[in-house]
Amino acid sequence: MNLKNYIFTHEMKVRDYECDLQGIVNNANYQHFMEHSRHELLDSLGVNFGKLHEDGIDAMVAKITIEYKIPLKSGDKFVVGINLERKGPKIIFYQDIYRLSDGKLCTKGIVETICVENGRLTRGEIFDEIFKDYL
């Protein structure tokens, strides 16, 4: 686990209610972890996701692919690493989740996002400015 390879990292801890009957994190919660980390990335850049919506700008997930490697369990501390790139009208987020206790890769995600401004699909140039240091 080399967290220096990511433009942003965010640490979290698994809560009991995020686990299923098998005692591991329910697969849907990995999407929540990734979404929260993307919002934290924006926040670290001085951008509030809710305020974007109020201003008529909505970043939306168009496609998500998640590869599950090993499960997280209740109480596990983990880190989400993020990289991103622009591909045409989409911003693609590459998000990896590592368990902090041993540095093992738990999940790899690719999240393709689009931008809708005032109800119309756009290229989302505002995100070029927001992510200018990373694109």
Which functions belong to the PLM regions below?
Residues 2-60, 116-135:
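Hot-dog-fold acyl-thioester-processing enzymes
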Residues 3-4, 9, 73-74, 84-135:
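HotDog/MaoC-like acyl-thioester-processing domains
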Residues 13, 67, 112-114:
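Residues in well-ordered beta-strands of folded domains
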Residues 16-18, 64-70, 101:
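Short, well-ordered turn and helix-capping elements at secondary-structure junctions
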Residues 41-92, 108:
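Hydrophobic beta-strand-centered segment that forms part of the acyl-chain substrate-binding groove
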